Amino acid sequence: MTPILYLLGGIVGALVAAFVYITIASNAEANHQDRVLSVAPIGPEFDAFLRALHGAAGNCVVEGNEVEVLQNGDEIFPAMLGAVRASQSTIHFSTYVYWAGAIPREFAKALSDAAQRGVMVRLVLDSEGTGLMPRMLANQMRDAGCKVTWFRRMQWFDWMKYNHRTHRRLLIVDGKIGFTGGFGIADEWTGHAQSPSHWRDTNVLLRGPIVAALQSAFTDNWNQSTEELLLDMRDFPRLTPTGDVPVCAVVSTPANGASAAQRVMAALIAGSTRTLYISNAYFVPTLSFIDALCAASDRGVDVHILVPGPYHDQKLVQRASRHSWPRLVEHGIGIYEYQPTMMHAKTVVADGEILLVGSINFDPRSFALNAEFGVAIVSRRLAADTVRSFEADIERSIQVLPATIASRGIANRAMDAICYWARAQL
């Protein structure tokens, strides 16, 4: 064979391999479609809906918690670092993003200092998401006494597992204070969304019995990475009520059947009767979710969706997202592109009653492939606060109109369709 034939054969082989890989992942997604036949509406039958939420999440709604919503790096990082510096017994930290920069160095120092004063510090770092992390930071923490492990490094003999990441963001201090949300340990999350280099995100601080669920999610990833079981009393201290907010943990792990993240999202959409406010950085709904959102709008629910605009770190995901917009807009759903910077939040507010916050993206990867964590917070006050933040974000956004979609042209729409076909691997 001539060199050109070898080259052509290699190209064809690569294309076939890519097709098989995407098809396998797409089939996984197809097995995770949610079609909610019926669910108690949130408003008129709230207690019944909470029981349904329990069934969807696979966790009870836990009473007696204190919850604080933290917007952007200016609020989340001082709170997290303050908790680390005040720690006394344990720090458990799991993150998908840990890059280079000033804030990663500050966290490495704070965690190292904690370990040196006798605190047990454990970190689970996703091996894909932390690819930009300088190894000197990991070495610094290990030398100080921190236990650091990487989740699912690439292994040629088990390469399909590499497709399943831990996307969870969890910080648990002394087993009593927990943080979760969309944050990453990178300078992009610093500030207050004031410029393109400072991203927009939403996170929560939790105290009370619900923190045990965060600890459990961390120990799950730790066990997968190290085969160690964390059962010490220091890891699971006695937790007493500290507030009056009910919270349900959404601990989502890839499985055969719909994941907890997908089930809860489907329940919130199906149960809504008045309003739905969705902020999501990677909004690529499956066909069944497009049906569910359109059905919600058709029955009178006021649906608004906030997505990134000109600043997006995953342009192919943005194209896939845009493929879903025509039908949603046709059914009266408001879609808004955030203009100032990358919008990285992952929140849902349903009927002004329930707020969902966490790492869960509205895409097949979060629903079928990644380990995720979120909390469904039952609080009108916190829901109202988040809606006010959403409305402030809309003022800095541009609404997607039918004319906007039509102006994209055939070539752009064709590329959007191709990206949507490959959505399971974006």
Regions found by a protein language model. Name each.
Residues 2-426:
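Charged, low-complexity intrinsically disordered terminal segments
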